[in-house]
């Protein structure tokens, strides 16, 4: 883990490594949190389900959050979400707080896309980044996932559709902090195809 961590940090020119922790959790995931000094947490499930190239993308993704200063906002979002649950019985206060939380979630979904780019830059392997997103979509098991079908789903999601599709997308994403894996794959593919990844 430390070797992959230092490789990702080197690729992103991270001069001072943050602390890295492994949390016991069977789910695939990681996070970068903290206020004054951010740190990274990777789940044990991530270590079990990913190969080194995919892990480098995850760690690069979290380092991207760190480099962009996202950890402070992530921590604020977590705190405000807890507060919103506690004051939900207050009509006016909860509406205002829920509005702030909704805006932070929308911002966070955009931050996830920029962190995905950092993960791709750290990993230097678009196919590993795609496998990672497929594992996020399918729970880690790629034996039942068709790459072509997944990319078609990403393209279909990206194309959008009519007003009804837009409303469905809005409802699907309203309470999420992360875009759907297919949407993330579409954005990543667009970035790679544009040539910006190569620069």
Predicted regions and their residues:
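Hydrophobic or amphipathic, alpha-helical segments that drive membrane association/targeting
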Residues: 1-33, 102, 108, 140-141, ...
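Peri-catalytic and regulatory segments of divalent metal-dependent proteins
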Residues: 1-72
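Short helix/loop segments within enzyme catalytic domains
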Residues: 2, 8-14, 92-160
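Conserved short-loop catalytic and cofactor-binding motifs
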Residues: 43, 103, 172
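Charged, alpha-helix-enriched surfaces in structured cytosolic catalytic cores
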Residues: 49-54, 58, 71, 75, ...
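Post-HEXXH active-site segment of zinc metalloproteases
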Residues: 70-101
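Generic alpha-helical structural context detector
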Residues: 78-85, 101, 120, 131-135, ...
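Pan-zinc metallopeptidase signature
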Residues: 132-199
């Amino acid at each position: 883990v430390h070797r992959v961590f230092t490789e990702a940090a080197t690729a992103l020119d991270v001069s001072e490594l943050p602390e890295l922790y492994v949390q016991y959790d069977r789910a695939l995931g990681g996070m970068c949190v903290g206020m004054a000094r951010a740190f990274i947490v990777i789940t044990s499930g991530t270590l079990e389900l990913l190969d080194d190239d995919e892990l480098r993308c995850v760690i690069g993704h979290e380092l991207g959050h760190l480099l962009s200063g996202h950890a402070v906002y992530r921590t604020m979002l977590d705190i405000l979400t807890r507060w919103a649950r506690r004051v939900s019985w207050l009509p006016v206060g909860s509406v205002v707080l829920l509005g702030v939380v909704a805006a932070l979630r929308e911002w966070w979904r955009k931050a996830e896309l920029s962190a995905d780019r950092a993960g791709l830059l750290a990993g230097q392997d678009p196919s590993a980044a795609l496998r990672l997103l497929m594992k996020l979509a399918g729970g880690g098991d790629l034996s039942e996932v068709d790459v072509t079908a997944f990319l078609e789903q990403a393209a279909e999601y990206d194309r959008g559709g009519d007003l009804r599709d837009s409303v469905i997308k809005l409802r699907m994403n309203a309470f999420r902090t992360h875009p759907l894996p297919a949407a993330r794959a579409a954005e990543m593919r667009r970035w790679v195809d544009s040539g910006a990844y190569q620069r």
